[in-house]
Amino acid sequence: MVNDSISDMLTRLRNAICAQHKVVQVPLTNINKNILKVLQKEGYIKNFEILFERKSGYLLVSLKYNSLNQDKPCLSVLKKISRPGLRMYVRTKKIPKVLGGTGIAIISTSKGVMTGSIARNLGIGGEILCYIW
């Protein structure tokens, strides 16, 4: 059993990108599903689907690569920020701009999981889960 499902998912995505896989399988949890929805909406992954096998389920994620250079993935860096031993919470005005706005910060708020820019526009803070660029 994995204690931190977000770190596990990010590591699986990172390893699949390094191995240039087209799809990767990650455990099915609500937080993983919500993070993947944000990544799909922002254009970092193609899509994902929920599959069930016996008692447990998993998410099958289709990775996205650049159209000009098929070897270069759309996801280059996935960095976990908040971890079980040290949670990182921010107010609205302290939400960081990742790489000057090139990347995204994924934040868990009272309104759900969203990007840092959307949370800033809504005027709500939350827990910084990870940075993506």
UniProtKB/Swiss-Prot annotation:
Subcellular location, principal: plastid
Gene3D superfamilies per the UniProt record, alphabetical: 3.30.1370.30, 3.30.1490.10
Subcellular location, record wording: Plastid, Chloroplast
One GO MF term: structural constituent of ribosome
InterPro entries per record: Ribosomal_uS8, Ribosomal_uS8_CS, Ribosomal_uS8_sf
GO CC annotation: chloroplast; ribonucleoprotein complex; ribosome
PROSITE patterns with a match to the protein in the record: RIBOSOMAL_S8 (PS00053)
Keywords: Chloroplast, Plastid, Ribonucleoprotein, Ribosomal protein, RNA-binding, rRNA-binding
UniProt keyword annotation of Plastid present: yes
Gene Ontology biological process terms from the UniProt entry: translation
Source domain of life: Eukaryota
Transmembrane spans: none
Signal peptide limits: none
Family: Belongs to the universal ribosomal protein uS8 family.
Alphabetized NCBIfam families for the sequence: PRK00136.1
Complex formation: Part of the 30S ribosomal subunit.
Functional note: One of the primary rRNA binding proteins, it binds directly to 16S rRNA central domain where it helps coordinate assembly of the platform of the 30S subunit.
Name assigned to this protein: Small ribosomal subunit protein uS8c
Native source species: Cyanidium caldarium (Red alga)
Lineage: Eukaryota, Rhodophyta, Bangiophyceae, Cyanidiales, Cyanidiaceae
